[in-house]
Regions:
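Proteins enriched for Cys/Gly/acidic motifs involved in redox and nucleic-acid/cofactor modification
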Residues: 1-206, 245, 261, 282-294, ...
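Terminal RNA-binding accessory module
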Residues: 14, 336, 347-447
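Active-site proximal loops enriched in glycine and acidic residues that flank catalytic Cys/His/Asp
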Residues: 21, 200, 236, 265-267, ...
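Alpha-helix N-cap/loop-to-helix initiation residues
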Residues: 27, 63-66, 93, 239, ...
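Residue-level signal for inorganic ion chemistry
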Residues: 56, 91, 198, 234, ...
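Conserved SAM/AdoMet-binding glycine-rich loop
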Residues: 86-87, 95-96, 191-315
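Short acidic, glycine/proline-rich loop/turn micro-motifs
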Residues: 273-276, 344-348
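Contiguous mid-protein beta-loop-alpha structural module that forms a pocket-lining wall or clamp
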Residues: 312, 328-329
Length: 447
């Protein structure tokens, strides 16, 4: 790590900072908190890295490919912008801090997401002891500068022990924010965002550490009552943790709670689910998803799937494929398993050859794309309330991407529109997190 430091006061006044986020919506929120902290100390945020003197990279460690992508980005930025200071934070740096510190291109490493630690890392003459777990909440995020949708982080960390997951090692135990703090932040963000996404690492466990009567359903009910003009969307949530009260809120909200659920599946084989240390069976997942789909219509439905987990046989893969084909998914995030240091799965025998795992992942992605395209086609001619993300694009409540026709529209607003056109042809390729592109329809103002 480059430890050269220049003169100056231990603050960020005058620093021009460019941010890059890898990974999940929780990371997007954390980057915004870093930005807000730095701006409060006098730093300037820039959208062009060529204008920056410091870059903050908020990394992801969900897969081996995610770690590699972050390190490649460090080297590429250093090569193209040799005068740029590089500060690395996030989940990858939490688990691989020593590796980043050994990289000569890196000027500062923050093992985690603490925005104060990031701000101090930008001022190189200040040294801060590393912490494994930053506090949850405490400072309210006023807005999401980089998008028309706002991120509303309600908790961090996870108490489950899935054998494949390194994110829980990086994020620590589940910690919920107080409801009043979340409501106050939602009111601030609602001033500039018409849609707020409830995010975290394990939002289905929201409130378990806060005492009786506080849970995700009660929080959502309070948000819907407090901010009736805002559309709320749930981030990733386990299917078995969606209670009937939450379904009733979604069904009866008139779209104020977006009809969209991302419910991690991981595998359709009970043998593999046991090896993954998941807490549900294939049938429990299947039954709950079908109950949800029967109650909510239309419904954008996504899932995470891991292909090629250690010990996964052809028949296990076939069971996963069959379950995907049975359930009404509209998109999938699929990626081949990769060993994550410190996880139980990294020590399991019977690893599936990489080329077989990659082939299985590609096959499942193609099924997901076919399902998504068919779902998009079924929505043509329907009315949808679209969150305007830019003057030419938006997102429906059921998670369809749309191109906007007609007059330019104001980002950060909601508008009823008629869906039209044919879903754009998609490819089954995916990035480090296995995310496939969403189908794209066209939309025009409703008559």
């Amino acid at each position: 790590m480059n430890t050269d430091s220049g003169p100056g006061a231990p603050d960020t006044r005058g620093a021009a900072v460019w941010y890059h986020t890898f990974g999940c919506k929780a990371n997007q929120y954390d980057t915004e908190r870093m930005r807000q902290e730095l701006e409060s100390r006098g730093a300037l945020t820039v959208d062009d890295v060529a204008r920056a003197d410091t870059a903050v990279l908020n990394t992801c460690t969900v897969t081996e490919a995610a770690d590699r992508e972050a390190m490649r980005t460090v080297r590429r930025l250093a090569r193209r912008h040799p005068e740029l200071r590089l500060v690395v934070a996030g989940c990858s740096s939490a688990l691989r801090a020593a590796e980043y510190e050994e990289m000569p291109q890196v000027d500062g490493v923050v093992p985690g997401h603490d925005p104060v630690a990031v701000a101090l890392a930008v001022a190189p003459e200040v040294h801060l002891a590393a912490t494994d777990e930053e506090p949850i909440g405490g400072v309210l995020l006023r807005s999401n500068r980089r998008g028309s949708r706002g991120w509303l982080k309600i908790q961090d960390g996870c108490d489950r022990k899935c054998s494949f997951c390194a994110t829980r090692l990086a994020r620590g135990a589940s910690r919920s924010r107080l409801p009043g703090e979340i409501l106050a932040e939602a009111e601030l963000q609602a001033e500039s965002h018409a849609e707020l996404v409830l995010t975290g690492i394990h939002i289905g466990h929201y409130g378990l550490d806060l005492g009786a009567g506080t849970n995700l359903s009660s929080l959502v009910a309070d948000l819907l009552e407090r901010l009736p003009g805002v559309r709320f969307r749930l981030g990733s949530i386990e299917a078995t943790e969606i209670d009937d009260a939450l379904l009733e809120l979604m069904a009866g909200s008139g779209g104020a709670l977006a009809p969209h659920l991302h419910v991690p599946m991981q595998s359709g084989s009970d043998e593999v689910l046991r090896a993954m240390r998941r807490w549900h069976t294939r049938e429990q997942y299947r039954r709950r998803v079908l109950e949800i789909a029967d109650r909510i219509e239309p419904l954008g439905l996504g899932a995470d799937v891991i292909a090629g987990f250690p010990g996964e046989r052809d028949e296990d893969h076939a069971e996963t494929r069959a379950l995907i084909e049975e359930l009404p998914f509209t998109y999938l995030h699929v990626f081949p398993w990769s060993p994550r240091e410190g996880t139980h799965a990294a020590s399991l025998p019977d690893r599936v050859p990489r080329e077989i795992a990659a082939g299985r992942a590609l096959e499942l992605r193609e099924i997901g794309i076919e399902a998504g395209t068919a779902y998009a086609a079924s929505r043509v001619g329907k009315l949808a309330r679209v969150a305007i993300e830019s003057r030419t694009s938006g997102l429906t409540g059921d998670y369809l991407r749309v191109r906007l026709r007609g007059a330019n529209r104001e980002p950060g607003t909601l508008e009823w529109m008629t869906l039209s056109g044919t879903a754009t042809d998609l490819k089954a390729g995916a990035g480090a997190t296995g995310r496939a592109a969403l189908p794209v329809l066209e939309a025009a103002a409703a008559p």
